[in-house]
Amino acid sequence: MSRKLCTLNFTLSGKQGSLVIRDIQLWSNRPTASKSTSEXRGQFIQYVDLAKLPLWVRSTNMNTYRCYSTSATAQAYFKSKLRNANRGIVIELXDKVDQRSQEPAYLIIFRENTELNCFQVDLTMKHEFDGQVTKLKQDIGKTRASVSKEGSIDIIIQQXQQRKIGTKTKVYRNVHINDKRLQFNETLSKLILGGLRLRGISNSITDYQKLYKITFDAAEFTHRDELKRISMGSGEEVSFESLQETVETLLKLFTKS
């Protein structure tokens, strides 16, 4: 046996102001605990295509209510707006909320053949989806944070290794440069000492140290370009023959007298 549940009035807002669609009676074929008939108020939200509604909007065990109205305005409105069988009218109920989310409750009024029906939007599955999406975002956030942290550690380790390699390379380079310069000094010193001995100049002579030093300094100046390239790591060792020729020339010049 059908029983009247409530009478719905909802407001339309437009350029001409607000129009109230009155006396929409909702009837149910299922038994209900309450025997009183309530007055419900609502606000028009939008028109929807029923074929494109998400699956969670309407559950399989949801109540569908029959709608009647004695208002000529309401009858004309529904006849005009629900010509398309796939069209629905979304109404936000002003004095009823969804028990789970405490958000406003919604009705969708539609036409099925010649009858006017409506159902309340089921938000249960939507809340489950929202909860899963929120959890998924949190999990993704944690994963990204972990990946970012691990990535940062990897970068730090890599940078440390590169610094170590760079330091070692620099040390090896400096050692190599020092070896070349040391080899130059040793060779130059031996050539000068040998040249002085060949000329019969012993270290007992007063100007021996002075002659050694000016020859050494002059040889360094002669090969200053090669030594500069060596200090920059791009030069080759000064050949023995070239250095020997320089020392001989300088000693001839300094020992003429």
UniProtKB/Swiss-Prot annotation:
GO terms for biological process: DNA replication; regulation of DNA-templated DNA replication initiation. It holds the Pfam family Sld7_N. Keywords: Cell cycle, Cytoplasm, Cytoskeleton, DNA replication, Nucleus. Its main location: nucleus. GO terms for cellular component: cytoplasm; nucleus; spindle pole. InterPro entries: Sld7 (IPR016808), Sld7_C (IPR041260), Sld7_N (IPR041564). It is found in: Nucleus; Cytoplasm, Cytoskeleton, Spindle pole. Disulfide bonds: none annotated. Belongs to the SLD7 family. Required for the proper function of SLD3 at the initiation of DNA replication. Binds to SLD3 and reduces its affinity for CDC45, a component of the replication fork. Required for mitochondrial morphology. Interacts with SLD3. This is Mitochondrial morphogenesis protein SLD7. The lineage of its organism: Eukaryota, Fungi, Dikarya, Ascomycota, Saccharomycotina.
